[in-house]
Amino acid sequence: MIEISTSILSVKKGKESQTFIALEKAKTDYFHIDVMDGKFVEKNTYNIMLEYASYIKRISNLPLDIHLMVEDVNSAIDDFLAVEPNIITFHYEACKDKEEVKQIIKKIKENHCRVGLSVKPETKIEEIYEFLPYIHMCLVMTVEPGKGGQTLLTDMVDKISTLKNYIDKNNIDVDIEADGGINLKTAQAVKEAGANILVSGTAILIAKDYKVIIDELKR
């Protein structure tokens, strides 16, 4: 089953509340919260995303899909655990070594939250294979992290396929989330490669009818 995690990075100012309500009615599966610190990536959305996540938690029962694009992962986890997310995803590249990756996975799990691990386009997917049995989701960035509205990097489709083959071969129970440049033209290739959760923001938010786009992305 394909699920949709709608990124709210490009939500229009002044229309946040009505947009969040409309997305829930349109049957998005998750709200995707893009948390950036201005260091790991250039853009800084940290405070506004914490504010949005807190607000969504008050008005909606839909799960929060927190994507940390930050250098100080531990502090961000502490801040965003307060909004009781369904899953917190952090970047492999934000950790100084593999031991820190293990420690962060443990910390998130100890706080009764699901764990996701993300990789940038230039990171070889094989580098995170050893962590797959201990996480709930692997997020494959299909664009360079840091801003919305980018074009999907087509070679990331092969990366997803490689990951999916490894997961199936080793009978590992882990979701694959694809994030970046996902729209009606690119979604099919990503789904066929093995992604079962699609992050889409711009393609949904510019549509007149969110449900039409979300339903089509799920097919």
Describe each region flagged by the PLM:
Residues I2-S7, F31-I33, L64-L68, I88-F90, ...:
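Hydrophobic faces of well-ordered beta-strands that scaffold small-molecule active sites
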Residues E16, L23, D34, F80, ...:
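Conserved, mostly hydrophobic/aromatic
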Residues Q18-I21, D72-A82, T123-I135, G180-L198:
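Catalytic cores of alpha/beta
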Residues F31-L50, Y92-C95, V143-G149:
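Glycine-rich, proline-tolerant flexible connector loops at the mouths of alpha/beta enzymes
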Residues T45-I104, L117:
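Glycine/small-residue-rich loop that forms an oxyanion/phosphate-binding "nest" at active or ligand-binding sites
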Residues Y46-I66, K107-G116, M156-I176, G180, ...:
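Alpha-helix-loop-beta-strand connector modules within alpha/beta enzyme cores
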Residues I88-K96, L139-Q150, A193-I213:
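Glycine-rich phosphate-binding active-site loops on the catalytic face of alpha/beta enzymes
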Residues S118-M156:
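Histidine/lysine/aspartate-rich catalytic loop segments that bind and position anionic ligands
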